[in-house]
Amino acid sequence: MIRVAISGAAGRMGRSLIQAACQYEGITLGAASEYPDSHLIGSDAGEVARVGALQIPLVDDLGKNKEAFDLLIDFTRPEVSMANLVLCRDQGKAMVVGTTGFTKEQRQEITRAAIEIPIVLAPNMSVGVNLCLKLLEMAASVLKDDVDIEIIEAHHRHKVDSPSGTALRMGEVVAETLGRNLDQCAIYGRQGLRSERPRESIGFSSLRAGDIVGEHTVIFAAEGERIEISHKASSRMTFALGAMRASQWVSDKPPGLYDMQDVLGLLKKVN
């Protein structure tokens, strides 16, 4: 049985992760944390997630319960994830990280930590989204430079980073397949008068509204036809169950930096 700790356990995603851990075979909840000033510190994690009492209190520092878990699942914010990274590296514990919005320097620090511990880092742990990434690779390899490419994403009004980590990963997959550098070809939003759209550019548009869980569409537009590859999530449980699958997969892996393509066995390149 794999004992997982969940950081940010009282948040929307954290509660879904607790629910998923309680129903996923081979996984059990060992510890749960919330930010230090939360009024829920000390509350039963199961009651917070509405799955019934689990006798696991929310703590403000997982270091206090380091013997209670084997692996940490983190869907929080970059600064919290980086603090948890230090804890897991020092304790030799695996991590599954779904946090987005990391800086280049923070990603480099995660890469260095992966020399010592196994880490699954993925902006989206939905099986469907990761299948879409493979479809995007296939589409880009066939369509090449003969199409205009736009990525549109929508999330709830509380999401703080934009574009989403998933949208950026989709852009990276397309750019890498086409031999482009996303940092050089990405255009984030458009306003006012501009020159004609450069063919090599990849456009991003973001919507933030209501309670949208997550929607992503990549458009390949040519003269006379348009291909759209879309994914729409209706529940956070799709991400939570993906995180459980990643946790089970990485639990016996050697140190290294992995993503959901590794977890799902989708790394074989499209010809």
Curated annotation (Swiss-Prot):
Listed Gene3D superfamilies: Dihydrodipicolinate Reductase, domain 2, NAD(P)-binding Rossmann-like Domain
Catalysis: reaction(s): (S)-2,3,4,5-tetrahydrodipicolinate + NAD(+) + H2O = (2S,4S)-4-hydroxy-2,3,4,5-tetrahydrodipicolinate + NADH + H(+); (S)-2,3,4,5-tetrahydrodipicolinate + NADP(+) + H2O = (2S,4S)-4-hydroxy-2,3,4,5-tetrahydrodipicolinate + NADPH + H(+)
Main location, first listed in the record: cytoplasm
Xref: InterPro entries: DapB_C (IPR022663), DapB_N (IPR000846), DapB_N_CS (IPR022664), DHDPR_bac (IPR023940), NAD(P)-bd_dom_sf (IPR036291)
Pathway(s) the chain acts in: Amino-acid biosynthesis; L-lysine biosynthesis via DAP pathway; (S)-tetrahydrodipicolinate from L-aspartate: step 4/4
NADP is among the record's keywords: yes
A biological process term (GO) from this entry: diaminopimelate biosynthetic process
TM stretches of this protein: none
Keyword tags: Amino-acid biosynthesis, Cytoplasm, Diaminopimelate biosynthesis, Lysine biosynthesis, NAD, NADP, Oxidoreductase
PANTHER family in the cross-refs: 4-HYDROXY-TETRAHYDRODIPICOLINATE REDUCTASE 1, CHLOROPLASTIC-RELATED (PTHR20836:SF0), DIHYDRODIPICOLINATE REDUCTASE (PTHR20836)
Family annotation (NCBIfam families): dapB (TIGR00036)
Function: Catalyzes the conversion of 4-hydroxy-tetrahydrodipicolinate (HTPA) to tetrahydrodipicolinate.
Family classification: Belongs to the DapB family.
Protein name (database record): 4-hydroxy-tetrahydrodipicolinate reductase
Species in which this protein is naturally found: Nitrosococcus oceani (strain ATCC 19707 / BCRC 17464 / JCM 30415 / NCIMB 11848 / C-107)
